[in-house]
Amino acid sequence: MALVTVDGGAGYWNPHPGDDPMAMVIDELIPRCQRLGLGRPPRRIAAMGISMGGYGALLFAEKYPHLIAAVAAISPAIWTSYPQARQANPAAYASAAAFATNDAVTHAAALGRRPVRVASGYGDPFYPGVHALARVLPAGSVVDFGPGCHNDSFFAAQEPPSLAFLAGHLAT
């Protein structure tokens, strides 16, 4: 298993003028990895992220399920509404329509039967959004809620089980 990380910037993994991190993954990162012999499709790629990256991993798996074998999201930054997202981060979505198009909860059915693992601490400000997502995830998804906040301590504690989850699904 190879681990490749990217920084999706501050645009919440959806297209903005001059920035499209999802296109960067599809058009640049995956082809580069394939040239190196890593993550050969179909479905030998897993996505994982923390906070905004966790949201991005889920969004990527929803938009490109044919590419993704499994997905893990640690404290995914999932807003429950466009006004909430706009108030907290005005640059996250260009419009209410962009939020609706990229709402991980609304589009969770696109995950199909894809193995999914999500984790969030009860003290995480994104817990309400992650909890809403957990209610609509595919059957068999692993949901890990417990004590913790949106911080490095919680993230670090969730990295080993998330990586093990992905490795287990890539090995099959």
Task: Go through the PLM ranges and name each one.
Residues 1-172:
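Non-catalytic cap/lid and distal C-terminal segments of serine-dependent acyl enzymes
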